[in-house]
From Swiss-Prot:
This is Protein GrpE. Belongs to the GrpE family. Residues 30-39 have a biased composition (Acidic residues). The lineage of its organism: Bacteria, Bacillati, Bacillota, Bacilli, Bacillales. The gene is grpE. It comes from the Bacteria. Pfam families: GrpE. One of its GO terms (cellular component) is cytoplasm. It is found in: Cytoplasm. Residues 1-25 have a biased composition (Basic and acidic residues). Homodimer.
Length: 203
């Protein structure tokens, strides 16, 4: 009977010791797990912070890239416009290269036309006028080759782009706003008016 009780006490002590060791082991492991969890959370937070910083840097770089692209596009457009203006200026210079010469020749044409309208009876004077007319026609042909042409006026509707009204009349024989007389010829070089025609216009 005594032996049986002693055996039970021994088993009870063994159980208690085992339980105590288990509890000690748990109490020893718990702080380590907590430390590991804290470290993991800290690591995750650091990674999150680093990722946030990286995203911010990426956003800044993308903004700078967009700004650089926009500036490049503006510069490219400005250069294209500049190149187009230069080309147009060169084309205009080539197209209207004779403008200065033509402007200087117009008064000479006017003098030829006034001289050719003079009525003469003397044969020598007639021969002189014939020679002048030949020179005049040669000059007109040379100017035509450069694109110079006289502006039509009499009987045409008044056009302020090519006509300069210096007088107005009320003539029932003409439609209103019609050129009835030309005082001085106007000329165009290709599509550019070198000198408008001086005209009389019906009201």
């Amino acid at each position: 009977m005594f032996k049986g009780g002693e055996k039970m006490e021994k088993e009870q002590r063994t159980y208690d010791e085992t339980l105590e060791q288990h509890e000690d082991a748990q109490s020893e492991q718990a702080p380590e797990e907590q430390v590991e969890q804290v470290e993991n959370e800290a690591t995750q937070q650091e990674e999150k912070d680093e990722l946030t910083v990286a995203y911010e840097k990426i956003a800044q770089l993308e903004a700078k890239l967009a700004e650089t692209e926009n500036r490049f596009l503006r510069l490219h457009a400005d250069f294209d416009n500049y190149r187009r203006r230069v080309r147009l200026d060169m084309e205009a210079a080539e197209k209207y290269r004779a403008q200065s010469l033509v402007s200087d020749l117009l008064p000479i044409l006017d003098n030829f036309e006034r001289a050719l309208q003079v009525q003469v009876e003397d044969e020598k004077a007639k021969l002189l006028l014939q020679g002048m007319e030949m020179v005049y026609r040669s000059l007109i042909e040379a100017l035509k080759k450069e694109g110079v042409e006289a502006i039509e006026s009499v009987g045409k509707p008044f056009d302020p782009h090519v006509h300069q009204a210096v007088m107005q009349v009320d003539d029932q024989n003409y439609e209103p706003n019609t050129v009835v007389e030309e005082f001085q010829k106007g000329y165009k070089l290709k599509d550019r008016v070198i000198r408008p025609a001086m005209v009389k216009v019906n009201q």
